[in-house]
């Protein structure tokens, strides 16, 4: 204790001395920069004076060898501002030596060797390699710290950073100063957003303000030219977040071209592109998924030959890229033909050019190429071409040189004539023949030579001057001629020859006089001898098959004047043929009309003999077949026995009846067959039984058994075919109906059949029309040509007034055109599979027969007016501008019609245009003819929201029971149909709709709907069938699923056996009312035909649909689908086609009222009806009272016309 107090004062004195003594500094400043490794800090060493360390911090003071006191090393830590990037360390040492500075954090330690050359040194340490928000401690070996020896760098924000995407879902940000990295997920909410991200460090959170990338871009494009690329998932700003995507997005395609977004891009059509969107982000890019781009234009590439002559061709070329490629415009059109000299093309409009080829040679098949170049301002596109072959018309042969004919005399009255033979190209048409005519004051002499221009004329008149005319006629009847003269020489034996000639002439004259006397006597004794016509027939050339259409066009032009002239030039009655038997008083009651009587020479004579052998019927020749037909009047009650006697005696097995028993409240024919409920009728010795009766829409087939009680054991089968679709006035508007009737009749013929009995009412008009069509088709098949005029004249020589009115004469022409253009396309179910296999077969690159059949179909583009649907007020009501209903069959409904009643078409025609505008409402829907009756289907587009009320009103007024929907409301993002029903009752204007029940099946949904007008109490119940297997496809994958749904609709709606339901239209709708609707309507009618007749005719069905609405069954794939559906509906089992049983039971038909309400096709509203002649039906009493009076004109079939009032026939729709 005493020692401590003794040393205390000494220690205190030493401390005071150290504290008060000034710090020594060196008088010279030296800076030494020491650079370590890349991971070592940069050290700045300075010998500048530094503040003295507090004495209180000194530890371990000791004396050195010299006896002085040695002060231990001390250091102080000074952290400068971070912007200077340095750390100061003050070291006070007692001598120069090497020090080691240790900087440590929790994980690592850095050693920095430092040399001190003075007692006190300040060291700057740059800390780029240090991390922010991290605690560090600084220690120096063998030195004591003054103050704190730890520090941290609280740097909170980054100044510079980089970014690099990591896959599609992450991006990594790296601080360029501190080498800090953080990866974050890319989300939709953060796309293109400026946001801070934090890195959690030891003492604080380090923040980087970054620009987030977008989620992986997706690009879309419009399928059109020009197209536009769109960044479909581009982030959009919301209420809380502002998206700031940079305008650096480009689309790069395989042609190494970059395109901007939302700008017109002209790509080449039908070329495959691979396009990728690229978003520039920092020093890299973010790519979208590659998109395959291939834009197919719906090219319309049509050529129409507007004029073809013997030396020129004018063609209109319509080259339109379609609605999808409206951006393609043409810069110029051009054309070139082989072997031609001059061709010019004139641009008519943006898509059409008129090309004129002139100075051509006659009858040459030219191969030409049309070219169109796209406007270069929109890009480099290929040149579009269209090749065609066309032959120029024929002209007169090049045979007009007067020096061409050479005459060489061989004797005094003989010579040879030669001329230069024409080369093939000099005929200017098909090779023909040479004709030589010798002209003098005597009868001309004519010779033909089909091989060469060489003729020999012998035994000519002596001393006579002849003009020799050589005519070259090519195969198209064009002719040229050349002439020469030559005189025969005098004969030295002229006298002898003259005497001989005089004797011969005298003898011949005497014989001629005797012959004429004999003929005169014979004429007086035989009054029925045929004499020459006092009115010669007109010379009308036969028509070849290839010229039927052109002939029809020529004759129908100018309101059918040529048809009228031809028809009126044929005598109605050939008065040189007697009609004595028909005019006998005892036979007059047997005639239905007093002026339609059979000629005596070819009337059918019954075997009863005497006065009872008369019947109003005539044998008629067919095409090269005598007595092929019997043309008879419709039997009267008084002549039914005679009719059956004629059938029995002539062994006829087929009766064709082309009328109804009553038409227009007039009796046309007695019912001479038994009805099903009576089974048999007895007409004196004849017993007629009915075995079966088949009802079809246009005809009824009855299978009868005919017995003759006088001939035991005799029984014959007679087929009775009654055509019921001939309208009361005019003629059938569709000639294919008569072709179908002909096929039915011929299907029952056999080798042993007698004459076919054909009758209407008078047995002349409709009867003659049917016979003419049948015979002319045989002529067309045998000779490739028809002589309609000659055959009708021939018919009238056999029975008066055959083919009674001009409309029937025209109908014969249109029926032959129909047959020649389309042929026989009807197929029975028993042969369907074998025929279909044949149709599908292909021979190399040639199209199959099925494809050729489809190509025959007319397109009927704009063949009827569409004024209502195309008006400005109604354009907005159409989904598709290419599918607008025709005016003649559009569905008309009226807002002022109260209640659930359908509009009467006859009443509609009486409306004025003002009334129609005010009352009739427009909806895009068309009436479609069904198999059983007209207007039994309605094809409609999917209703828009703005037309939902009109759609429901149409259903309500048409009393529709069944509604077929073939689309979803939306498909592939496109609106196909507004959903006009809902879970709860919906109201649209005055109409309400409610779903009462929903049934879901694998392929369709059935909804039971109730529709009501707020103005009426009646509720309409409708079954809606929505087909589910058509979504996103051009055709259903399984055709049988559609067939099955149609069968279920037929069964549930009782359409198979209910005439009432057949007349109520079924409404079918898809997006535009044609693309899918047309297939369903065609299939519906074909199935009806198959079930009823065991026959189908796909071509005729599609042709009829195309005439009723645009866009129906437009592609070969849709056409083939119908065949595929029928193939599956009627499969082959055990080698035979499995046909469904006929669901239509035979019905008892009262002929006096049957089918009077059925709609009938007419030849058009603008065609006049044939005027009926002022005739009264004769009866027995009237005949007796007026047997000596002049008979009045006959009352015909409602089809007769007087000579003062001829009518025009039907208008043929011809597309070539």
UniProtKB/Swiss-Prot annotation:
Positions bearing carbohydrate: 64, 92, 98, 135, 160, 179, 185, 205, 240, 283, 301, 349, 365, 375, 393, 478
SUPFAM superfamilies: (Phosphotyrosine protein) phosphatases II (SSF52799), Fibronectin type III (SSF49265)
Main location: membrane
Location of the Tyrosine-protein phosphatase domain: 563-819, 850-1129
GO biological process: T cell receptor signaling pathway
Domain Fibronectin type-III, first and last residues per copy: 71-165, 298-395, 401-491
Transmembrane segments: 494-514
Domain of life: Eukaryota
Residues holding substrate: 728, 760-766, 804
GO cellular component: plasma membrane
Sites bearing Phosphoserine, chain numbering: 881, 903
Extracellular side: 27-493
InterPro entries linked: FN3_dom (IPR003961), FN3_sf (IPR036116), Ig-like_fold (IPR013783), Prot-tyrosine_phosphatase-like (IPR029021), Protein-Tyr_Phosphatase (IPR050348), PTP_cat (IPR000242), Ptprc (IPR016335), Tyr_Pase_AS (IPR016130)
UniProt biased composition (Acidic residues): 904-919
Positions in the Cytoplasmic compartment: 515-1216
Region (Disordered): 26-67, 899-919, 1154-1216
Alphabetical list of SMART domains matching this protein: PTPc, PTPc_motif
Subcellular location: Cell membrane
Reactions catalysed according to its record: O-phospho-L-tyrosyl-[protein] + H2O = L-tyrosyl-[protein] + phosphate
Listed GO MF terms: protein tyrosine phosphatase activity
UniProt entry keywords in alphabetical sequence: Cell membrane, Glycoprotein, Hydrolase, Membrane, Phosphoprotein, Protein phosphatase, Repeat, Signal, Transmembrane, Transmembrane helix
Compositional bias (Polar residues): 26-49, 1154-1165, 1204-1216
Enzyme Commission number: 3.1.3.48
Catalytic residues (positions): 760 (phosphocysteine intermediate), 1070 (phosphocysteine intermediate)
Protein name: Receptor-type tyrosine-protein phosphatase C
Originating species: Cyprinus carpio (Common carp)
Taxonomic path: Eukaryota, Metazoa, Chordata, Craniata, Vertebrata
């Amino acid at each position: 204790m005493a020692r401590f107090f003794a040393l205390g004062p000494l220690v205190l004195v030493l401390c005071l001395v150290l504290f008060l003594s000034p710090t020594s500094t060196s008088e010279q400043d030296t800076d030494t920069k020491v650079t370590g490794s890349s991971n070592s800090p940069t050290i700045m060493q300075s010998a500048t004076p530094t503040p003295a360390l507090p004495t209180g911090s000194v530890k371990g003071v000791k004396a050195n060898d010299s006896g002085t006191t040695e002060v231990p090393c001390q250091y102080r830590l000074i952290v400068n501002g971070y912007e200077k990037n340095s750390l100061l360390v003050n070291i006070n040492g007692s001598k120069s030596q090497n020090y080691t500075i240790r900087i440590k954090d929790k994980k690592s330690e850095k050693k920095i060797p430092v040399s001190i050359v003075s007692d006190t040194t300040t060291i700057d340490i740059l800390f780029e390699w240090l991390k922010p928000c991290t605690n560090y401690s600084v220690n120096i070996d063998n030195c004591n710290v003054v103050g704190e020896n730890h520090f941290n760098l609280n740097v909170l924000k980054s100044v510079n950073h980089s970014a690099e995407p990591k896959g599609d879902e992450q991006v990594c940000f790296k601080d360029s100063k501190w080498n800090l990295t953080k990866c974050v997920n890319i989300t939709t909410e953060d796309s293109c957003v400026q946001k801070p991200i934090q890195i959690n460090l030891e003492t604080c959170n380090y923040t980087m303000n970054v620009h987030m990338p977008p989620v992986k871009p997706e690009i879309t494009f419009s399928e059109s030219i020009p197209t536009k690329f769109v960044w479909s998932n581009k982030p959009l700003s919301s209420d809380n977040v502002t998206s700031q995507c940079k305008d650096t997005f480009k689309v790069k395609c395989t042609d190494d071209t970059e395109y901007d977004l939302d700008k017109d891009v002209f790509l080449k059509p039908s070329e495959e592109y691979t396009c990728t969107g690229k978003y520039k982000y920092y020093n890299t890019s973010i790519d979208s998924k590659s998109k395959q781009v291939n834009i197919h234009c719906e090219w319309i590439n049509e050529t129409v030959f507007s004029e073809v002559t013997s030396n020129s061709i004018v063609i209109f070329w319509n080259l339109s890229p379609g609605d999808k490629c409206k951006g393609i415009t043409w810069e110029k059109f051009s054309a070139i033909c082989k072997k031609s000299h001059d061709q010019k093309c004139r641009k008519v409009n943006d898509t059409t050019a008129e090309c004129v080829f002139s100075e051509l040679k006659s009858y040459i098949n030219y191969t030409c190429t049309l070219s169109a170049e796209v406007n270069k301002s929109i890009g480099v596109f290929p040149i579009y071409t269209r090749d065609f072959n066309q032959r120029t018309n024929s002209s007169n042969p090049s045979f007009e040189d007067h020096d061409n004919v050479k005459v060489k005399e061989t004797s005094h009255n003989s010579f040879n004539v030669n001329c230069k033979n024409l080369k093939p190209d000099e005929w200017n048409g098909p090779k023909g023949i040479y004709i030589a005519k010798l002209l003098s004051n005597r009868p001309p002499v004519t010779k033909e030579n089909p091989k060469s221009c060489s003729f020999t004329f012998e035994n000519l008149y002596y001393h006579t001057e002849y003009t020799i005319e050589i005519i070259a006629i090519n195969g198209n009847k064009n002719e040229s001629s050349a002439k020469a003269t030559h005189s025969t020489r005098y004969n030295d034996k002229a006298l002898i020859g003259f005497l001989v000639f005089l004797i011969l002439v005298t003898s011949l004259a005497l014989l001629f006089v005797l012959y004429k006397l004999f003929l005169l006597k014979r004429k007086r004794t035989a009054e029925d001898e045929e004499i020459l016509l006092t009115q010669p027939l007109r010379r009308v050339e036969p028509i070849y098959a290839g010229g039927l259409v052109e002939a029809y066009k020529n004759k129908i032009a100018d309101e059918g004047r040529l048809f009228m002239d031809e028809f009126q030039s044929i005598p109605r009655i050939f008065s040189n043929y007697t009609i004595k038997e028909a005019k006998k008083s005892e036979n007059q009651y047997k005639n239905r009309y007093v002026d339609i009587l059979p000629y005596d020479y070819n009337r059918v004579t019954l075997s009863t003999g005497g006065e009872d052998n008369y019947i109003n019927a005539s044998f008629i020749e067919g095409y090269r077949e005598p007595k092929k037909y019997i043309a008879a009047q419709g039997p009267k009650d008084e002549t039914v026995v005679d009719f059956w006697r004629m059938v029995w005696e002539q062994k006829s097995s087929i009766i064709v009846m082309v009328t109804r028993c009553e038409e227009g409240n007039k009796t046309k024919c007695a019912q001479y067959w038994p009805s099903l409920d009576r089974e048999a009728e007895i007409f004196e010795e004849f017993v007629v039984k009915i075995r079966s009766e088949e009802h079809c829409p246009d005809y009824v087939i009855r299978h009868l058994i005919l017995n003759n009680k006088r001939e035991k054991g005799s029984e014959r089968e007679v087929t009775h075919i009654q055509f019921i679709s001939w309208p009361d006035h005019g003629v059938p508007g569709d000639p294919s109906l008569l072709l179908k009737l002909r096929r039915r009749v011929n299907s029952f013929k056999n080798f042993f059949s007698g004459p076919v009995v054909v009758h209407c009412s008078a047995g002349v008009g409709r009867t003659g029309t049917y016979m003419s069509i049948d015979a002319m088709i045989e002529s067309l098949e045998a000779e490739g040509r028809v002589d309609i005029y000659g055959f009708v004249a021939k018919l009238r020589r056999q029975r008066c007034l055959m083919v009674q009115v001009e409309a029937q004469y025209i109908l014969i022409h249109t029926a032959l055109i129909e047959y020649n253009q389309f042929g026989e396309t009807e197929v029975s179910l028993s042969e369907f599979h074998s025929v279909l296999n044949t149709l599908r077969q292909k021979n190399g690159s040639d199209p199959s027969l099925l494809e050729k059949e489809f190509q025959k179909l007319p397109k009927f583009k704009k063949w009827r007016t569409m004024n209502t649907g195309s008006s400005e007020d109604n354009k907005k009501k159409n989904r598709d501008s290419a599918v607008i209903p025709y005016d003649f069959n559009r569905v008309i409904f009226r807002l002022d019609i109260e209640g659930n009643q359908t509009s009467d078409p006859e009443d509609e025609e009486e409306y004025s245009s003002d009334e129609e505008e005010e009352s009739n409402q427009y909806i895009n829907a068309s009436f479609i003819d069904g198999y059983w009756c007209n207007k039994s289907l309605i094809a409609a587009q999917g209703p828009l929201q703005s037309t939902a009320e009109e759609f429901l009103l149409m259903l309500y007024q048409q009393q529709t029971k069944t509604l077929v929907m073939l689309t979803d409301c939306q498909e592939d993002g496109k609106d196909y149909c507004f959903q006009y029903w809902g879970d709860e009752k919906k109201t649209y204007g005055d109409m309400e709709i409610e779903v009462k029940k929903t049934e879901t099946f694998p392929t369709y949904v059935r909804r039971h709907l109730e529709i009501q007008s707020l103005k009426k109490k009646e509720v309409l119940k409708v079954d809606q069938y929505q087909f589910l297997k058509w979504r996103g496809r051009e055709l259903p994958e399984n055709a049988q699923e559609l067939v099955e749904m149609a069968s279920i609709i037929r069964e549930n709606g009782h359409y198979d056996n209910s005439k009432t339901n057949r007349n109520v239209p079924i409404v079918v709708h898809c997006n535009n009312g044609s693309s899918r609707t047309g297939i369903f309507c065609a299939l519906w009618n074909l199935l009806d035909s198959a079930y009823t007749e065991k026959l189908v005719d796909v071509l005729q069905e599609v042709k009829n649909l195309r005439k009723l609405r645009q866009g129906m069954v437009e592609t070969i794939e849709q056409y083939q689908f119908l065949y595929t559906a029928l193939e599956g509906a009627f499969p082959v089992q055990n080698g035979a086609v499995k046909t469904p049983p006929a669901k239509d039971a035979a019905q008892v038909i009262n002929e006096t009222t049957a089918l009077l309400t059925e709609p009938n096709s007419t030849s058009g509203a603008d065609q006049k009806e044939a005027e009926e002649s002022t005739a009264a039906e004769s009866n027995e009493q009237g005949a007796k009272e007026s047997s000596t009076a002049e008979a009045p004109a006959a009352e015909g079939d409602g089809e007769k016309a007087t000579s003062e009032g001829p009518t025009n026939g039907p208008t043929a729709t011809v597309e070539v």
